[in-house]
Amino acid sequence: MSQAVEFQILTATGWEDYALLDSGNGLRLEQYGRYRLIRPAAQAMWRPALREEEWQSADAVFQPSGGESGGQWQVRKSSLPDVWQMGYRHLRFQVSIGTSRHVGVFVEQSAQWDWISETVQSASQPLQVLNLFAYTGIATLAASYAGAKVTHVDASKK
């Protein structure tokens, strides 16, 4: 006889600088701070809910060229800077469009950043954190801001 396993589903809440505006036809329309971006989303096989005008207002569109990371950004509006700031709760960080579909923040990870902050703050003694494969470093920011001493390691050349 098998036993039931309990688990908690973490959801990404608390964003003011990010919103998933719409998705469909293999794409997603997202708001990153003041800027709207269109990125591929192969799982979004339905029709978009918003009108075409909303999609046309995007500042940039990522055009994939095959493979997971191949492609380039088509900038539609010259007002889109190379780098801009965003925030999540008390954390501030920079994002940018570059040579991949990613912008330097994985918004779905915000539930983990909250967990990290809460765990560090509620610890009975100061914590030391080793963040391997740290990539953009927002988990490092969360741990450090909460009071941990953090070693940040990533092999990315960015």
Language-model segment annotations:
Residues Q109, W113, G137-T140:
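Hydrophobic alpha-helical segments
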Residues M1-V5, E52-W55:
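Short, compositionally biased leader-like segments
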Residues Y32-G33, L132:
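Single, functionally critical "micro-switch" positions that shape active/binding sites
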Residues F7-I9, G24, L80, L130:
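Generic hydrophobic-segment detector
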Residues G14-E30, L37-V107, D114-S117:
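Non-catalytic substrate-recognition/targeting regions of SAM-dependent transferases
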Residues S2-L20:
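Short, Gly/Pro- and small/polar-rich lid/capping loops
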Residues T11, Y88, K158:
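Short, motif-level signal for alpha-helix interfacial/capping segments enriched in acidic residues
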